[in-house]
């Protein structure tokens, strides 16, 4: 029979239940690289090591050979005073004593006042973009938002194209009704024959038997897609899927290019000296840069002579050294003891005074007389002129370093230091590979799109999910473009100084440059008088010197007439430096300085790092309704269906006369159920369905393995030395340095003219020790001595002026996870699901009598599409389909503009004082400076107050007897003596 018209198009079903959430998507692109770090500030130089204690004195040199005793002269008149003997040669130098053991470290002093902060350096040029940062952990899914109100019903879909009518069969002749045969098996479909001409209307034949159901034809091509209807309400969220397996870590990316170091800022003035801690047992730190020389301290007050110390143990006798250079000429010896009075002779006749005879030749020097007893000390002589400054002696050998002292008790924590500059960013870790894709769920029936509802109010914040494991870092992205240069913000307050770090190991560098020579120490205490030397061997007679200026007659002394002042002797050797003076009391704390004006505005800093990704935006408004598509073209006629099976031939009846046309018979009873049809073929994919509602957020991925630690940044460059700080308060005199080497002997003075020998007076009584003379002119500065003991620290001064703001700190750690964002925009349209299995065939009607197969009729026009039927019930949720292939990674977004710098916070209170740093090794002694020109002689000082008499020293070695001077003219005859005894 002819093909019936197409049924009405069904209504669009209600939206299906959302499928299970898909597997976690691929990891997002890496964030833009952070700005390059800045080099850290140079650390403070180590403190100089404490010098070891002075070693015990070496053994005393061997005593010189005593001179030969002279033959005693004959008793007679008292002889003339002998010429002063020359000073004996200096004994050989004793061996060098063993170096002393290091002294105990002093108790840590209080912390010094805080230094004035240095000026802030200009920011360095912007370095190349650093390596890309790791992706942040995926946030946990928030609770679903409230369901919006249901949208209005959608518009009916577009009317589908009119289907083609099947070929109209030719009406067969009415045959006799045969016996109903058993339905045969469905035969193969034959090829459709060409359409025949319409024949004349025949008589209605008997109803033929129902044919076997034909094979389902291929579905027609999809019609043009109608306009999208409004979006329906979102369905309830599906159950949460299982977390995917963590991906394997990917290969390590290349390290980013190293940024150029910025210029080093100007170094601030040196801070105050911290407390001196006890020397630790660790390796000493690298030698610090020598600081600027301090101001020269004023001369200290003369201390009282100390008591004789306990003699140290005698060291082993050293090898006899080479004889030292000849010492300077000694001072004249005391007059000899007057001889005993001879027996007075008889008084002679007083003769007339004779004329003075010519000077006789100088006789050979007589034998040296025995030394007389030392006479009483004479009155203190006038202060002589300052001698010529001697050349500095050779530099002594450096002593062996002292042993390391025990580690001291850690001091109180030091003040918090300024925040260091950011170091360079390390190389990024390797990227991780994407995890395995989950199975894809079957597509549910497409719902009728409703209008977009008004966004509902935000739901209550959900509980924070457990933080996901850290994802594997992704590949290093290309460096992004530099952001716009932002305006410089207000200077921030200086941050609290951080605690000092632990002492680092001793560096392997060479010793630093020698330090500047130290300031001259205070004059030492006057030494004890030396022992009187033994009489030396008389030397050869010297040439007669030029006549010296005649001195003024002295006032008559108690012990006799004062002789003529002799010439000025050569300068003596420089005295050994005295002991260290006591530290003076700490000065009062200075007034609090006024707060300085804010500094100039600095250069804008480098662009800041890209911020974290913001929450997904709210759903956009629905798009405008699209234009209706063009009507599809009429499809080509399909191939003719196969011919049905030929029925069994009926019995041949007699040909009767044609009767009148009968009325149309009524429908027969329903036929028996036919055989099940063959399975339908899979049709071509239908058109893409409408976008479903957005699915709930996917589960939080498991924490990936920890990325490899990037290489450590290179150490910053050492900055140039800063300007010298302001001069501090004048400190107390430091300890005296070690004794300098003996100076070279000065030129020998011109011998003065021998004065007239006065009449020896009676031996006077021994007088009191004279008062100490005034201090001489300060000598030239000797080589730098070892560092003295550190004095107690002064009180902590007032807080300094607030410095310029510090550099921006490192980027803080990510904060806690925020509340989940709103549902994202709808995802892309899913693939169409596979066609379901064909349903069972309907019950066939009662078979009619088979008629002959007529020719195929022409295709009629397709009927109009009927109205859509009511929506059927929602089917169950299909199984989850396999996940689609991973899409390509999106392009990297542009770097946002740098935000304005925030206002500076209020400066916090200063932190507690930090622990003192470890004591550094002592710096190498600097070379001796060039000798300066001799200073002008100072004015003679006033007589000082009588000092406390010092202890009398042991007698010095006996000096040699000097050569005999020229014989003087004979004196006038003496008065006659008293008569002798009978």
From Swiss-Prot:
GO terms for biological process: extracellular matrix organization. Residues 8-27, 89-105, 128-141, 189-228, 304-335, 347-373, 382-401, 425-437, 513-526, 583-597, 610-640, 666-682, 727-751, 874-888, 916-940 have a biased composition (Low complexity). Keywords: Calcium, Collagen, Extinct organism protein, Extracellular matrix, Hydroxylation, Phosphoprotein, Repeat, Secreted. The modification Phosphoserine is found at residues 81, 586. Residues 39-53, 889-900 have a biased composition (Basic and acidic residues). One of its GO terms (molecular function) is extracellular matrix structural constituent conferring tensile strength. Residues 294-303 have a biased composition (Gly residues). Forms the fibrils of tendon, ligaments and bones. In bones, the fibrils are mineralized with calcium hydroxyapatite. It comes from the Eukaryota. It is found in: Secreted; Secreted, Extracellular space; Secreted, Extracellular space, Extracellular matrix. Residues 1-982 are annotated as: Disordered. It holds the Pfam family Collagen. Coiled coil: none annotated. Prolines at the third position of the tripeptide repeating unit (G-X-Y) are hydroxylated in some or all of the chains. GO terms for cellular component: collagen type I trimer; extracellular space. InterPro entries: Collagen, Collagen_superfamily. Residues 143-155, 792-802, 838-853, 966-982 have a biased composition (Pro residues). Trimers of one alpha 2(I) and two alpha 1(I) chains. These protein fragments were extracted from fossils. The tryptic peptides required multiple purification steps in order to eliminate contaminants and to increase the concentration of peptidic material. Type I collagen is a member of group I collagen (fibrillar forming collagen). Belongs to the fibrillar collagen family. This is Collagen alpha-1(I) chain. It comes from Toxodon sp. The lineage of its organism: Eukaryota, Metazoa, Chordata, Craniata, Vertebrata. The gene is COL1A1.
